[in-house]
Regions:
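Pyridoxal 5′-phosphate
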Residues: 1-239
Length: 239
């Protein structure tokens, strides 16, 4: 608790919504703002060292050897837009999502499917109480077929905490030649996530929950499927 500024006898447990700010994160943010006071003191390496350090830490967290496959983004929707910008669909193909999935991982796919006149498949939560998560996992696997181009989902559902077996889902996507895109916002930082076991084609995580970062920041991992791709915007520093 001493790492946070939480007054009184409060116990904060709702990081699934938003984590409290760590003292050292707040300090780093203030320090970053202060550097603009004296731009003449900035060195060329200052544009890259801090970012590289963050990328290395995130890579270590997900057991990724090549930290250069990590990119920083302002949001999950931005990271997902970079994914959808580099996927072409046939009208006969589909994209599989979870029912009531968070909009950041829905709207980009809606636009992509509309653009290519393809199909968007939502796997809805079963209307049962016992073994609901088990059945939901089974339904996801059943919806993945030879027409599936992409499965995009979280390891943990944001609305009710259902856990999905991404290793089994990854195996099924490989069998049909589909991509697996993961929104790790609800799990990475709170639960183990091994990139070498799950092997997603892309992983996007907002930092303001279990990663204990500030709002308006996200980490993205892009696998080989997106090598030589096109970002949604071009700048001198984003390649």
């Amino acid at each position: 608790k001493q790492k946070f500024i939480l007054t009184g006898k409060k116990s904060y447990l709702n990081c699934a919504y938003m984590s409290p700010m760590l003292k050292k994160v707040e300090k780093a943010g203030i320090s970053g703002l202060k550097t603009k006071r004296s731009p003449h003191k900035l060195m060329p390496t200052d544009f890259f060292n801090g970012v590289s350090n963050l990328k290395k830490q995130f890579a270590s967290l997900i057991n990724l050897k090549d930290y250069e496959r990590v990119a920083l983004a302002p949001s999950v929707s931005y990271g997902m837009a970079n994914v959808t910008n580099n996927i072409k669909l046939e009208s006969s193909e589909n994209v599989v999502l979870l029912g009531d999935q968070f909009p950041s991982n829905v709207y980009p796919w809606m636009s992509l499917v509309k653009k290519h006149n393809a199909e968007l498949v939502f796997v809805e939560k079963p209307k049962i109480e016992k073994k609901c998560g088990e059945l939901w996992n089974k339904k996801v696997l059943e919806k993945i077929n030879k027409k599936t181009k992409v499965v995009s989902m979280g390891m943990v559902h944001w609305a009710d905490g259902t856990i999905f077996d991404l290793e089994k889902i990854r195996k099924k996507t490989k069998e049909v030649g589909a991509l697996l895109i993961v929104d790790g916002t609800q799990s990475v930082g709170a639960m183990p996530f091994d990139i070498n076991k799950i092997k997603p084609d892309a992983l996007v995580c907002a930092a303001y929950k279990w990663l204990m970062g500030p709002y308006g920041s996200a980490f993205c991992y892009y696998g080989e499927a997106f090598d030589n791709g096109s970002p949604i915007e071009e700048s001198w520093i984003n390649r």
